[in-house]
């Protein structure tokens, strides 16, 4: 503690510069000055979305990113772009001929436009779940039990068409039902 150490001072206008330079980030990590920055690593299967003061400002590519948080609120949302299974569990439904049946369906969905997905709905998966529920109800209620048993593939196609027509605004797609 008694040795003389050289200190370099570099002024950075954080009001004008949002992104933290890599050479500064390494030094800040080493000194644990993390309160002034928000950093994250966006994986290869993810899309990162940068929100500054609640406004979407940029889509982040895979890699390490850091931003000055002095004088502003920084939030980074990471959205998984891989197909995700979505299971609509045991719904009790009545067929056209008033027979009670229990329907379970698994769909695979994928986010194709992360900006739309982040801005369109608070929870895209919950919205997709409800859309699939409505589609199943519509397809089953219009048929008798015998028609349902004979036309399972047709019902899958109807459910997929119903959901596909409504999820474009959510930035998602159904890859398989």
Residue ranges of model-derived segments:
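N-terminal hydrophobic membrane-entry segments
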Residues: 1-177
């Amino acid at each position: 503690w008694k040795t003389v150490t050289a200190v370099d001072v570099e002024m950075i206008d954080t009001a004008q510069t949002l992104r933290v330079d890599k050479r500064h980030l390494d030094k800040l990590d080493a000194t644990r000055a993390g309160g002034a920055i928000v950093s994250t690593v966006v994986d290869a299967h993810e899309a990162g979305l940068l929100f500054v003061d609640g406004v979407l400002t940029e889509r982040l590519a895979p890699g390490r990113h850091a931003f000055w948080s002095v004088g502003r609120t920084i939030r980074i949302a990471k959205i998984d772009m891989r197909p995700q299974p979505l299971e609509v569990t045991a719904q009790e439904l009545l067929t056209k001929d008033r027979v009670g049946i229990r329907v379970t369906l698994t769909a695979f969905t994928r986010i194709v436009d992360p900006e739309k997905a982040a801005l369109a709905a608070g929870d895209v998966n919950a919205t997709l779940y409800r859309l699939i529920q409505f589609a199943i109800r519509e397809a089953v209620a219009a048929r008798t039990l015998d028609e349902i048993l004979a036309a399972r593939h047709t019902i899958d196609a109807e459910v997929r068409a119903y959901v596909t027509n409504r999820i474009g605004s959510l930035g998602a797609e159904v890859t398989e039902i």
